Amino acid sequence: MRRAGRGGSSTLNRRSRTMSRRMLVWRDVRVLAYVYPGWHPIRERDERYAPGFTEWDLVLECRPRFPGHAQPRLPLWGRYDDRDPAAVERRVALCRDHGVDGLVFGFFWCRGKQVFQEALDLGFLGSPTGRSFPFAVMWANRMPRGVLPVRRADLPVIDPDRLVPTDVDDFVALVRTLAERYFVREGYIRVGGRAYLSIFDSTFFLRELGLDGARAAITAARAMLASAGLPPLHLAAIDPSAEVIGQVAGAGFDSVTHYVLLPDWKGPLLQDYQERAALRAREWPLVAARAQLPYHPSVSPGWDASPRGADFGDTRPDRYPWSPVITGEHPDHFRVAVARAVAHARACGLPPDQQLVFVASLNEWSEGHYLEPDTRFGLAWIEALRDGRVAATRLR
């Protein structure tokens, strides 16, 4: 397959370069990119690993695990500390100039304990462009992995210790914290006039609390916001399983979406990007029908979590983070996926301020999905997002 140069594919470069030097203004659908905030040291990892450890160590040291494996995947601009406003400024400006309308930051909270919040508080909100750029938060109700790279394949994929329990009081405290710190900001993303918040593991949230408990927690949080004069809430359920998807509307969620909706998690090791992306797009209307709520499509440029797993050689385990791996990913194919998602969002008949597309993600390098420049394709990933929007949306 044709490979793009460091500045992007020749097809993309023939398009007007002036588009990447100014903020694009779109008529309808908003495209929002998830942000993984784990690119700085934290005390918990300093104590568990070597001082200063971050997942950059995994990304930069990963080696091919099978013939043709595209590893390591290296950042063209080098490793960075996402608490540094200067490093964040450059990336936010790149998003602004290439059709990303806002960022959704993972917010790790476990009964008041927070980790990785400095990427948002110091890096993003500390940068001039960040302070004026739309953003929202996703409650990451799983704490970061305690062992990296993962070395045992006999343990649960999701360690029970990582799952974040909650109850009515804790959920209200979480929402109050987010509202007072972020919802009140002028640049905070609103959907239908309400502050946008998503829950990463909505299945665990509903399974743990039950339908009645989840409804009580969400109702109490909304009442707290109203009584405190804080912005009202638009709550999105991410990736609800078949077990709970019929409960999300009754619990009080307003919409459904996904984080990474690309691989078949129980499928073969190697899965083709074009096949998987097309199949997932056909599932979007089914998700909305099952949830009886608006569905906001999510697309990804790729998937390969190999950096998070130890090298088992030929005995590569058939499970996360070793498997599956998406192959054949390319900016041209991602451009098609973006155009398809934008067209779907527009065709759903929602009001313009409720038409959303999500991209996973801006920077989750250790899982192989990112828009930031890499050494294989240069700027072509984020240029593909821009050009996918051009293909599906008229400029104002």
Q: In which residue ranges do the predicted regions lie?
A:
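N-terminal regions that are enriched for targeting/export leaders
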Residues: 24-90
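Aromatic-lined substrate-binding rim segments of carbohydrate-active enzymes
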Residues: 87-137, 297
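Aromatic-lined glycan-binding groove of carbohydrate-active enzymes
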Residues: 28-37, 43-46, 206-332
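Substrate-binding cleft of secreted/luminal carbohydrate-active enzymes
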Residues: 325-376
